[in-house]
C-alpha cells in the first residue's frame, strides 16, 4: 500500500512538473504574437450542431471562467470547451474553469 501511495505521489509530481514546463513554454511567445493594449474582438465557436453549442454556452454562463490560450493544452483545473478565433484568423484554445 505504501508503494502504491509513493508511486501515485511521484506520478502526480511528474505531471505537475510537465504542466509547469508547458506553461513556461507558452509564456515565451515572441512579443509580436502577444496581444496589444488595443481591444480585440474574439469569436468563440463550438464544434457540433447548433443545439449542442447552445447547451454548451448556457452551461458556461455564470458558472465558468474562460480564457483563450495559445498553449496546446489547458492548464490544471481547466477543460477544453471550444476555440477562439481573432480578427487575423489565428485560432486559440478556449479553456474554461468551473
From Swiss-Prot:
GO terms for molecular function: phospholipid binding. Pfam families: Defensin_1, Defensin_propep. Disulfide bonds join 66-96, 68-84, 74-95. One of its GO terms (biological process) is defense response to Gram-positive bacterium. The keyword Metal-binding does not apply. Keywords: Antibiotic, Antimicrobial, Defensin, Disulfide bond, Secreted, Signal. Residues 20-63 form a propeptide. The keyword Disulfide bond applies. It is found in: Secreted. SMART domains: Defensin_propep (SM01418). GO terms for cellular component: extracellular space. Paneth cells of the small bowel. Residues 1-19 form the signal peptide. Has broad-spectrum antimicrobial properties. The antimicrobial activity decreases in the present of salt in vitro. Binds anionic phospholipids, which leads to the aggregation of liposomes in vitro. Membrane permeabilization of the target cells is an essential part of the peptide's mode of antimicrobial activity. No hemolytic activity against sheep or horse erythrocytes. Belongs to the alpha-defensin family. This is Alpha-defensin 1. It comes from Equus caballus.
Amino acid at each position: 500500500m505504501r508503494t502504491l501511495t509513493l508511486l501515485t505521489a511521484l506520478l502526480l509530481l511528474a505531471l505537475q512538473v510537465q504542466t509547469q514546463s508547458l506553461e513556461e513554454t507558452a509564456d515565451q511567445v515572441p512579443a509580436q504574437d502577444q496581444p496589444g493594449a488595443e481591444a480585440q474582438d474574439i469569436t468563440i465557436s463550438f464544434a457540433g450542431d447548433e443545439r449542442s453549442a447552445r447547451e454548451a454556452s448556457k452551461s458556461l454562463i455564470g458558472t465558468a471562467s474562460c480564457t483563450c490560450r495559445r498553449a496546446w493544452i489547458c492548464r490544471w483545473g481547466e477543460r477544453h470547451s471550444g476555440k477562439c478565433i481573432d480578427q487575423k484568423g489565428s485560432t486559440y484554445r478556449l479553456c474554461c474553469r468551473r
